[in-house]
Amino acid sequence: MARLYVFAEGQTEQTFADTILATHLAAHGVYIQGVVLIAHARKKGRTHRGGGRDYGAMKRDIVRFTRQESGGDVFFTTMIDLYALHNDFPGRWESEALRHLPYDRVAFLEKSWGEDVGDARFIPYIQLHEFEACLFAKPGEFALFYEREPQGLRRLESIVAGQDNPELINDGVETAPSKRLFDIFPDYEKAVVGPMVAELIGLELIR
């Protein structure tokens, strides 16, 4: 049996890990000890969590947890997006040379991050490009929430048709996966609808 802490970038990732991911991992003997909204700043003695662009605060938060949990049966991972990554993130600027090789770029950044934290139990995960990219694995599942918007559903299908892999939907300011969803469905509630659509799609297809 192993225990796992997940540091999530936002509420969408937190809900996904707390529900769908936790159930899947438990079946394989890995139990999520806690899903923590990752720190992004510390002001006036208070830690502010979720999102943010301060890598230093995020690293300090993770290191603090690794020091508190010294057992060999506990591991640490993350759920953060490649899109809009912190400017001071380890390997951030060097990884630009790999922009044309997105999976290699993510692997390079994960390796750089792991080395920077310096604990073998820390196995970071960076999503290419956003969590919402996973939802494009089967966009038809959005019909449960937007059945009265067939034109929007068709637009989702056309976006996927233009890519070999939903994860390759790019990370531009206006074209990142979440931006496309908000453009098509302005009332899209990402922290609620996102994890529910992911559950409908299923981890096997998302993977």
Where are these regions (language model features)?
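Non-catalytic terminal and connector segments of soluble metabolic enzymes
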Residues: 48-55
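Extreme N-terminal starter segment of soluble prokaryotic enzymes
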Residues: 1-5
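Catalytic nucleophile-elbow at a beta strand-turn-alpha helix junction centered on a G-D-S/GDSL motif
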Residues: 6-15
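C-terminal accessory helical subdomains adjacent to catalytic cores in phosphodiester-
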Residues: 14-44, 59-207
